[in-house]
């Protein structure tokens, strides 16, 4: 009710007692009939209480992290889940939100701390006879962590691509039917089609969900010599994006030199199957001939790459893992030089441990938190 005793809404009130709530604090939720007038009236009433204010974007999640309910990777997983557009993105975000990456990091960190402690014991008793040679156990610990971290780093590219989208570039000479094929794949007129060569002068992007995988199709400018200045700019961009794409679909005639070097898994097709006597390895965006088969091939290729995807889904994760791996490699290198170098090895391990702690948000993250939480809605 408002200050005059008039009913504002008939609502559901839920209470969550800390530390078992999402934030770890005592929380009350009002489930209202969500009209603008009702929400405005309730907010006006609540603002009259001392000590109340609107939450900052992501503040509830930030409190959950500060209260130990989530680590930083889980916070990012929650953000990715909110933004997920495809089934692969949803599943990946849930894996990160569930804390699997943080659990891995905790195991690695504990092993590195154990290794550093063993080295420190040897350093502390350098002038005395240490009854046990710690180097075999330290080496075993470091080798195990190193293998795990390198394996995780190897899967970061695909993990990042699932989050942001795989790029598939359609490449060929001008008027080869690239824009028509893009429109056929997208199911709409996303690119201008014309019989005039060079109609597409910039890279056109279309986001799609292919079998649950996020894919951005790139319609590139036709690659040819002797183009005018404006078209040449588009051609340069097309070459760059084509080389950087995760997969390339070439529309090329038999014996024609490919304008961008093909790599494993790239697809080469003959354009305009509707105008050919033989449709072998040909495709037509006009009639749709070969389009379903192309979609199946793209799904199969990208799907196979996604089978062993890692949990490090952000560039920040990859950078932290690489820093940790660098410290670990340096420690392993000096460890071979004997006990005289154990102090250096121990220091390198501390660098490696700090990188892992930054990954899960234990240290050096204040500036980063402001950026991450600013992308959350008020209700999170």
What are the functions of these language-model segments?
Residues 13, 54, 168-170, 193, ...:
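Generic preference for hydrophobic
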Residues 217, 251, 269:
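Generic enzyme active-site microenvironment
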Residues 1-91, 95, 99:
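A glycine-rich (often HGG/GG-containing) alpha/beta subdomain
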Residues 1-9, 13-17, 198-226, 247:
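Switch I (G2) and immediately adjacent beta-strands of P-loop GTPase domains
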Residues 231-254:
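Inter-motif core of Ras-like GTPase G domains
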Residues 15, 32-34, 170-174, 219:
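Flexible glycine-/small-residue-rich
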Residues 86-209, 226, 244, 254-380:
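C-terminal-of-GTPase-core extension/linker across diverse P-loop GTPases
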